[in-house]
Structure formats: structure tokens, C-alpha cells
Amino acid sequence: MVIDITKKYPELKEIYELTVNHTIWRKKECINLIASENVMSPLAMLLYLNDMMHRYAEGKPFKRFYQGLKFVDELEVKAQRIIGELLETDYVELRPISGTIANATVFKAFAEHGDKAVVVPVQAGAHVSHTRYGTLGGLGIEQVEMPFNIEEWNIDVDGAKKVIEKVKPKIVILGGSLYIFPHPVKEIAEAAHSVGAKLMYDVAHVLGLITGKVWENPLKQGADILTSSTHKTFPGPQGGLIATVTKDDYKKVSKIVFPVFVSNHHLHRLAALAVTGLEMKYFGRQYAEQIVKNAKAFAEALAENGFKVIGENKGYTESHQVIIDVREHGGGAKNAKLLEEANIIVNKNMLPWDKPEDIKNPSGIRLGVQEVTRWGMKEEDMKTIAEFMRLVVIDKRDPKEIRNKVIEFRKNFLEIHYGFKISGEEETKLLKIMLHGEV
């Protein structure tokens, strides 16, 4: 498809084609297994295209520095209530525009330059923002790693307690970007609170599993603060949030969000976030349960196809993630590229035994099933995907040959599940409203 105006302006044609080609490729022709991505429902996407993307708001609802925000203010409060209900707290801050900004806000609110934070090792899953190389280090806070038990694929609780007692950090950070089992919140909370530290749990990857009630809510287990993005297992627009147990902690983070890290907070995402929150309220448990079922089935199928899947002794996974060690097949970077040629999208990932210099071609590949689950795939489909991966990585078949199989397979999964359904006619009407204000 080419629109007429692109014939007159070649530069515009290139921009148009890159955008359209990407959309068709990723939405209709790929199997996306990136653990940090998801897709919104058509209703959420259409409401994302609203006039609020052109508008500015500084401050909190009904206390803004700009006029013209009466509907925005009501919408933001409504979105806070929806997310708060899902997380069982009255204290939700939606203004962070990413998970990293949410993390930075908490770090700044509860620690100062020169203070210490105890975190999960980066090779064992800590997000880069939790490290000396990222946001934590940028704020001058010292990263101290807690020990990790590779056999259990989880934090070494006794070792972590000793580290916390010894260094007396201001913040202890759980969660991250690579983890397949829940972190031990109660035990670590006791240790953190015994030295006066705040326990922050970065639930970006598992927010949908928590709001879907298949993972326990860390705020009910002893965590003081949750930070998160809103677009992984929680299938909303890209953005961030902070939730706290107490009003005092909420006030502290709110004073830091604005004006320290955020001025305007990308208002157009609020409607899509609220819609996704309602979708999780009504369909979230079914969605989250299927995610975990699919992840377990995928891990088992990968193992049966000859892959070295992490966590076998623990049932492989309790989350959306599956981790494979592909050292014997050439490493994570090489195989991620080969799989991309076959339209299977994954990412390389460091594993606990990797050294810092291995970052360009680490041992692992991280896989996530939250998006394919939203496209309606079930356990049997995980077996098919595992076979596609075996053909590329282990059997060394031509990725282009497998690509054709992948494209054909994806034709069966073009409708988003676990969300509100609207008709094609309603989509067209809503699009006209969003683009032109036509009612």
C-alpha cells in the first residue's frame, strides 16, 4: 500500500514504508518471544491515539501548572484507582514515563549520594538501572550484590541476609529483567527492615502475573514499594508506575517524580493504561494462568528438542520467561541473529556464570511467552515454536526456509485475546474521532 503524497516526497515515502513494513512484519509474520514486550488490544491502541499526546501537564491532578486539563485530570485519577484496585493499595503514582524513571525516583527518594543499595547480581537478572553502570550508579549510590544460588535459580537468602546486615544499605532491590521464580520477599523484607532499609521490588516483568493473581503481591509480603513498567506481562502502553504501602512513602516519591525526573508525563497513554487495567480486572487471571501454562509447556518442549533449559530441577519456570543456555551452539548473540532471520524474535542474555566481557555474546537466550499468549497461542503451539527453534539452532537449517513456516503458522493467530472486543465498524468510527474529532 502506498499513499499518494509519498509519490511527491521521496523522504516521506521512506519513513512511511519503514513504519508500515515494521508493523506488518512484527504483527503478522513474526513469533515474538522478547520477554519485555507485549501488544495492546485494538481498543487500547485506538484510545492511545488521542489528543492528549499534544497536551502538557505538570504537577498532580487538579493542581496543574497548565489549563485545559479537566478531562485529563479525571482520567488520571480514574487510572490510578483502577491500578490501585489491582495492586490493593491507595497509593499509586502513574507519572513515571518508564520503569527506569520509576526506579530512579525511588532511588532518589530513599538514598543519597554515597549510600549503598543491595541488589541481585546483573548476570542473575538485575535490570541495568539497578547497577553501577545504570541509574543507581548515575545517582552516586553504591551497588552491593547479594549472593545468588544457581542450583535454585534464586537469591541465596541466608547469604543475602548477611550482606544486608553487614553493609546496612538504604535500599534493598528485588526483581529484575531475568527471573523465572518469585524472589523471597518475606525473608528479605525482614532483613531490610532490621537495618532500616526500604525494600523495593521491581515487578516490571511480572506485573501482569501479579495483577492476574498467579503471583503473590509483594506489597502484601513485606515490600515497601513496587516499581514497574506497564507493557510486559501487563499488556499496556509503554510507561512506568510506582505503588507504595504507606502514604508517607507515596508523598516522598511523588515529590521526586515531578519536578526531578518528569515534567510532562505523556498524557495520551493514560486512557490506554486504564483500559488495559480494566482488561486485567476482567480477563487478567485467565491470561496470567495461560502465560504460565505456556511457559512451562514451552520449556518442556525445548528440552525435548535438545535445548539446555535452565531450571529443570525446579520445573523450569513459574513466570512468563524461559531461559536456554546455548553456549554449545555458538552463544546467545549468534543464535538470536539466526532466529531473527527465521522471524523468531528473541534476545541474547547474560547468565550467572558469564563474565563481564561476555556481554557481546553471552551464554543465554531469554524467551517470553506473554505476547504469543495474547495472540491466542496455547500449550500445543509452544511445541511447534520449540521445533522451529530446533531446526534453526541445533539442526542448522537455513533460517529463510523456516521463516516461511513461521509466516504460515502466524496466519492462525491474528486476533488479540484477553481484552475488550470491538467491531470493525466501531474501530473505524473511533479512529475518525481520534484523528479528526468527528463524532
UniProtKB/Swiss-Prot annotation:
Location(s), subcellular: Cytoplasm
Originating organism: Staphylothermus marinus (strain ATCC 43588 / DSM 3639 / JCM 9404 / F1)
Residues bearing the modification N6-(pyridoxal phosphate)lysine: 232
Plays an important role in substrate specificity (site feature) positions: 231
Biological function: Catalyzes the reversible interconversion of serine and glycine with a modified folate serving as the one-carbon carrier. Also exhibits a pteridine-independent aldolase activity toward beta-hydroxyamino acids, producing glycine and aldehydes, via a retro-aldol mechanism.
Binding-site positions, (6S)-5,6,7,8-tetrahydrofolate: 126-128
UniProt-listed PROSITE patterns: SHMT
Subunit structure: Homodimer.
UniProt protein name: Serine hydroxymethyltransferase
